[in-house]
Amino acid sequence: MTGSFSVKLKSKKGQFIVKDLNQNTTLGELKTRIAQATAIQELQLHVLVGYPPKPLDLSENRENQNLKTVGINSGETLIVEEKAGAAGPTSTPLASGSGSSTMEDDEALARRLQAEEDAEHLRQVSSGGSIETGALNIVQSLEPVISPEESGPNGNFNGILLKKVVPADNSCLFTSIRFVLNGKVDNEGSEMMRHIIAQEVSADTQQYNDAVLGKSNSDYCAWIQKADSWGGAIEVSILSNYYGIEIDVVDIQNAIINRFGEDKNFGLRVFLLFDGIHYDPLYMETQQNSVPATIFPVEEMGVYQQAEQIANEAKSSRQFTNVDKFTLRCMDCDVMLVGQGQAQEHAKKTGHENFEEI
């Protein structure tokens, strides 16, 4: 079977859909289609695929390879750029405003200390150090499972993976990550995490370019630091790398687990549940520990299998929001919009970024 499929192109000139492809389509044919869609000459194409985005080898000796061999599948998003003849961009420091006040300095210091505190928790866990009660907890070597079905056939955990409900605000991603890192449900870590992300993005304008971010690097850095800006894949990836821990996002709409940091071979992982618009952290209650466990060794597959089961059951019972069909109201001009696509297009045309689900 070689059924037809489509891929999505993202470029500075807009987004395009390339249809009627199949696994036997050659890379050379795809290059021609991309060039036609984006009006970029084939020799000037620079294409990135996957996340984090990695360059796709478009050399002539690969042009006869088919898409199956190359690893391009249905629904893939390709970031298309035009090769630049000028020198690569340099890092642009974040704008700090004129005359930083003592209060701003104190806030920056508080953010840094908070980040160091979370990172120190992870270092203690990684080295087998003790963690105070009330802080984050990791299950390292529990006794054999009394009820194997509770953690999966390959697990060593006597516990059940559960969802911790966090406030449904624009910072639910950061609140969830804060909880799995140190066991606290609060907004204190959100501003700090947004600042970390802005710093990382600002420091690498080549990787985090207009095509990847959907806006200029400087605009993104200002946007992500606003309290009403949502986080997603880019932000999860950056925080995974910053904290040195794999963050597994359990996508219940598609019944899959997206493993951020998998390629870094981190030894520990945490789980977040994503329903299409909202994130909640997952934790495990065990008989051995009064403090819920939120961080797990990557090699312990029992917990991972529980997360897969949660995804499958939630999808079956439709416990997710279809972002292509939900209704939003622009809080700036009261216009009604259907789906994420209309909201993004409205934001691009008007600059409005405050939306409320109806």
From Swiss-Prot:
GO terms for cellular component: cytosol; nucleus. It catalyses: Thiol-dependent hydrolysis of ester, thioester, amide, peptide and isopeptide bonds formed by the C-terminal Gly of ubiquitin (a 76-residue protein attached to proteins as an intracellular targeting signal). One of its GO terms (molecular function) is cysteine-type deubiquitinase activity. Gene3D superfamilies: 3.90.70.80, Phosphatidylinositol 3-kinase Catalytic Subunit, Chain A, domain 1. Substrate binds at I277. This is Ubiquitin thioesterase OTU1. The keyword Calcium does not apply. CDD domains: OTU_OTU1, Ubl_OTU1. Its EC number is 3.4.19.12. Residues 8-94 are annotated as: UBX-like. The active site is at D169, C172 (nucleophile), H278, H352. PROSITE patterns: OTU (PS50802), ZINC_FINGER_C2H2_1 (PS00028). InterPro entries: OTU1_Ubl, OTU_dom, Papain-like_cys_pep_sf, Ubiquitin-like_domsf. Keywords: Hydrolase, Metal-binding, Protease, Thiol protease, Ubl conjugation pathway, Zinc, Zinc-finger. Residues 274-278 are annotated as: His-loop. Residues 83-108 are annotated as: Disordered. Residues 301-306 are annotated as: S2 site. Residues 89-102 have a biased composition (Polar residues). It comes from Drosophila pseudoobscura pseudoobscura. SUPFAM superfamilies: Cysteine proteinases (SSF54001), Ubiquitin-like (SSF54236).
